[in-house]
Amino acid sequence: GELIEVAGSEAGKTIDQADPEVSDAVDFCHHYANASLQLTDEAYMAGARFVPVDVTVVASPWNFPVAIPVGGVAAALAAGSAVILKPAPPAKRCAAELVAAFHEAGVPRDLVVLAPLDDGDVSRYLVTHEGVDRVVLTGSYDTARLFRSWKPDMHLLGETSGKNAIIVT
C-alpha cells in the first residue's frame, strides 16, 4: 500500500498503474533470488567462474519508480554486489521507501544505500567514482552518452530511449 501511494503522489500513477508495478517488483525479487542460487550451482555454471563486482550504481527513472529500481537493485545484490540507488530527482521518496523495504527484508544497510542526488556535478562524481564498478542506467540515450563521456571505460548497462518498435512483415 505505501509504495502504491508514493508512486501515485510522486509519479502520478493511478492505483491501476502502480499496483501491477509493485507486483512486478515482487516478481523481480523472486526471480533474482532464484537466479543467485544458480551462480553457486556447478552443473549450471559448467566450469565458468563467477566473479562479482564490489559496487553497482543503479540510476533509475522517474516514470517507473518501483519496478525498475527494484529490478536493478535485486539483480546486483543477487550477483554479489553492494548497491547505491541513485533515483531520478522526481522519484526520491519512492526510492527511499524501496531502500527501507530492502532493509526490512534483511539486506544489511551497508549493502543497499540511497543517494538521492539532483542531476549535476555530484551525480557525475558518483557514477565516475573509482570505487564504482558498474552503472545500471534506465534513462535516455543522451544520459548514457553523457555518462560514457565522463568515463569512457565505464561498465555501463543501459536501457535507453526505447520505443518498443516492432516491424511486422
Walk through the language-model features, giving the residues of each:
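An alpha-helix initiation/capping motif
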Residues: 16-27, 120
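N-terminal alpha-helical segment of soluble enzymes
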Residues: 1-15
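A generic alpha-helix surface/boundary motif
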Residues: 2-5, 23, 96
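Rossmann-like NAD(P) dinucleotide-binding subdomain of oxidoreductase/dehydrogenase enzymes
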Residues: 8, 12, 29, 34-169
